């Protein structure tokens, strides 16, 4: 079954911009969103600013992607924790999010012999400690991209 997945850690706020978060943390994010930057119709506005560190490296299990992210962030846990708690006081916060697309035939597949098993993952004590220290939530988004049989 084709599987495309990635993980990211994000700080988010309706009041504090990603640039301000970067200044406070001293860490350059991989991606940012700006509140109101993806307006396609008057009703669609991102609800917050986001500062993200992302791992999209193919061929890694989710826990391996999360380890890559935390290897970058853990030296800054105290600053991330302080900022996350300030953001949470105004409705923002922190999240570690996992995004998985099952049956994603649009993604290039490795040869069957080379394809790693990407199913199954776990969070070790190191990850759980970081989530607890930073007050981050865990989000998991999973999508079945198989063609709808009724649409044929």
Indicate where each model-derived feature is located.
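Acidic (Asp/Glu-rich) sequence patches and key acidic residues
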Residues: 1-152
């Amino acid at each position: 079954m084709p599987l495309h997945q990635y993980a990211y850690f994000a700080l988010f706020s309706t009041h504090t911009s990603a640039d301000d978060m970067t200044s406070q943390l001293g860490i350059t994010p991989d991606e940012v969103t700006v509140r109101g930057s993806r307006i396609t119709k008057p009703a669609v506005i991102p609800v917050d600013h986001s500062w993200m560190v992302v791992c999209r490296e193919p061929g890694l299990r989710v826990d391996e992607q999360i380890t890559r992210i935390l290897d970058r962030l853990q030296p800054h846990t105290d600053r991330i924790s302080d900022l996350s708690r300030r953001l949470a006081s105004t409705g923002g916060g922190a999240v570690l999010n996992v995004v998985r697309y099952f049956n994603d035939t649009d993604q290039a597949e490795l040869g069957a012999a080379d394809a790693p098993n990407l199913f199954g993952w776990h969070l070790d004590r190191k990850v759980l400690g970081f989530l607890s220290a930073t007050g981050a939530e865990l989000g998991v988004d999973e999508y079945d991209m198989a063609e709808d049989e009724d649409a044929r």
